[in-house]
Amino acid sequence: MLLQFRAKTFFNNIAQDSLVTLITKRVGLGYRFLSSLCQPKNTALDSEGYKILFQTAAKSGSVVLGKLAHGHMIKSSLNPCLYLLNNLLNMYCKCRELGFARQLFDRMPERNIISFNSLISGYTQMGFYEQAMELFLEAREANLKLDKFTYAGALGFCGERCDLDLGELLHGLVVVNGLSQQVFLINVLIDMYSKCGKLDQAMSLFDRCDERDQVSWNSLISGYVRVGAAEEPLNLLAKMHRDGLNLTTYALGSVLKACCINLNEGFIEKGMAIHCYTAKLGMEFDIVVRTALLDMYAKNGSLKEAIKLFSLMPSKNVVTYNAMISGFLQMDEITDEASSEAFKLFMDMQRRGLEPSPSTFSVVLKACSAAKTLEYGRQIHALICKNNFQSDEFIGSALIELYALMGSTEDGMQCFASTSKQDIASWTSMIDCHVQNEQLESAFDLFRQLFSSHIRPEEYTVSLMMSACADFAALSSGEQIQGYAIKSGIDAFTSVKTSSISMYAKSGNMPLANQVFIEVQNPDVATYSAMISSLAQHGSANEALNIFESMKTHGIKPNQQAFLGVLIACCHGGLVTQGLKYFQCMKNDYRINPNEKHFTCLVDLLGRTGRLSDAENLILSSGFQDHPVTWRALLSSCRVYKDSVIGKRVAERLMELEPEASGSYVLLHNIYNDSGVNSSAEEVRELMRDRGVKKEPALSWIVIGNQTHSFAVADLSHPSSQMIYTMLETMDNVDFVDYTLVHFCSVT
């Protein structure tokens, strides 16, 4: 009370111009002081005074000061002019109070282009691009003279939605209205074209700009990083430095991210050189640079360097903890140890009194997914609800991914429905949830709903759907999605082209898959891996190995998926020596720990060439003795070579691991049957009957239109089964005539 009394007494005795000056300097003295500032009965402010208050609140982000000043203005009975109302509107937008801003905007008796620009800018900064676009159209219909800020909001919508057609139309309007030389707008256009994957147009604008600033460079660099380019961002940073421009933390962070794209020694060395340069400039501890450095070292598997950077930081906040936790989860194959370290960091930051952010929960949920710990994930979910973050779109996406991995699509749908802002990330996660659980029709339904909700699919959504089409042999649907990708410009993204390679290869069209591979301008390790695996599956072992060697020649470091493709190629080609060599190379030269798939492939390779004992010893010496898939690969080879001795041992081990799975019993029965040991084969049948094990029928499926039809032997469950069997019976009764003879008779 004493502070409030002294403040009132003091303010009542000073002139208005001095009062405004003091207001500007004393914003941070606390809520009671602000209340005293705005409420003295004998203090009158005119429009200029209120303008200073609103501008100060906007600059400092103090919505409390802004609201107090707004309330004081209402009580003063001042009739605000349009200029003052625009300052008030701008204050609410800058303070992210868009609800108040919209109410004020709707009630303003008069509005000009500045009014529209303030709210458009507020919407775009908060990610509400559709509302910004609606305001742009409203301003145009009102015949207001649109300026660079108005167009910037609309172009931001085009970039975020990857709407190239609309973006090019707006670009044309910018040129027609004489705004094409505005550096601010050129930067926005560069950013828009970059986000739409049209780097050639972005570069053309950049080259024609006579007054490039740091934002121009940053926009182009981040654009190349976004589409997966690695060399171009480094070249641009070097040119930026040669031109005498100060390197921004944003540019350095983007280029460090580029060094992570192709995880090869050359780029990592360049990243380390940039690290040294940032240390020289004193920027090493900048949060953007530090986060990018942690990410680079973690993705390269240099967790020791990342931990060292983290431990040397003089002060740690939520962002640095998030970066370090993410570092443990960046590997191709997240180990239980890495997940455990991520959990430890999460608990450590809480012990230090740091409140987890939505980003923290997102990465911790990723650790739960990697460790497949649904129960711990549910506990984290409860903590998220306690912190009132359950409606956050990023957390919603992470929860959907967790429940998808656990096969719980219903829980995933509930998380999706409770997300406050269903953006492209949450839509993509929900689609992925259905794809992972082999619900292709539901995935397509969601993809169509995505379009009807006026949200443009991004490159990851498109590549995900194309991969799903490849897995389910739905080539027609995949080609439709690729057509959309080409039309929207998304096909320029490396991830989309990679999915195209897999889709065409799985549909049997290797020439087209190879053509797409050749067209990729900046193939990454995923692109090479897709091509290697495709060639391997088609039996082109030598070609697959040539692609692998070419990848290494281009300086791209192989990952687990690339080596898996190589081992599959060796397996299908019977190249035992090469397969063993690459397996050792993966472990010793690249320090990549083989996973279950690698061991299974090597077991299959040894088994196919009759080295059954070696294959059995390999499983026993690995850490995958309890993994049925690996044993099943060996059991299949035992049947090929009619080895009932090893086959019996392997089958008994499988029966221990999967007592209710029929496959092991059937394979062992067939081994005995093929070996002529009929009595043992009958014993296996008796064992199946005693244990109540039934053979599951094999299924085939076909996609017609957007519907998947599955069939089993003697299946009567299909709604058109009667018609199908009638047609089959009719075809059986048809006497087929030699086509050549019929054709000859018709010609003569």
From Swiss-Prot:
PPR repeats: 46-80, 81-111, 112-146, 147-181, 182-212, 213-247, 248-285, 286-316, 317-356, 357-391, 392-422, 423-457, 458-492, 493-523, 524-558, 559-589, 595-629
A Gene Ontology BP annotation from the UniProt entry: mitochondrial RNA modification
Pfam family, one: PPR
Keyword Repeat recorded: yes
Gene Ontology cellular component list: mitochondrion
Molecular functions per Gene Ontology: RNA binding
Type E(+) motif: annotated segments: 706-736
Family listed: Belongs to the PPR family. PCMP-E subfamily.
Protein name: Pentatricopeptide repeat-containing protein At3g13880
